[in-house]
Amino acid sequence: IRQMQIPQPDFVLCCNNICNCMIKWYENIAKELNIPMIMIDIPFNPDYEVSDAEVEYIKAQFWDAIHQLEEYTGKKWSDERFKEVMEISGRSSRAWLEATEQAKYTPSPFNGFDLLNHMAVMVTARGKKEAADAMETLLKEYKENHEKGTSTFRAEEKYRIMFEGIACWPWLRVTSTGLKSRGINMVTTIYADAFGFIYDDFDGMCRAYANVPNAMNLEHARDKRIKLCKDCLLYTSPSP
């Protein structure tokens, strides 16, 4: 890292609500660079809904992290700034989730692997105005593709699938071209939608962070996947 002249961090901030493997990555970085690590743990939820006790547990960690950040940076927490970023994050998330929903059309107006590229913006910059603008532009493009009957999936869409788990990041092109050559389009994934967080206050943020695929119990995880498949017309329930 030093040889590449990348600015070194003063601390690392880790949350395991999406990827548990990040914990060890960040622990190693903190040890290697001899810097503090701030950890926010999102526990597995054995119940279907997120409990108030779970929200309180997560909220306490966030406030502890905030106090540490105030000490490290010399900057104070601002309720007004939080509300501003929350509103922008909501804009980004609403546009992003609606964009992913455009795959409900047959054929889909986009190649599902596009989501794995655009998702990077939601991961790193969801609370920035530029991200909200970008997601709204993406939604507009997908709607226009549907109206024109065009798609970024440059092949005949013979099969529509849900992609389970995280992307094969080192082999995105190999995975994408392998599926496309067989007429297979990934039209939905449990992974991409997980980065669309919508909430109205601090407690709502904590509840949203707890309501992610990694933290859901089996029944909730099952129902979410069934809904995604139904919404994207991967199958329909048999008539009663």
Q: Model-flagged regions — what are they?
A:
Residues 59, 63-192, 197:
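A charged, amphipathic alpha-helical module
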Residues 235-240:
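Conserved small/polar residues in nucleotide/adenosyl-binding loops
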Residues 1-72, 76-77, 191-234:
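Trp/Phe/Arg-rich N-terminal binding region typifying the photolyase-homology
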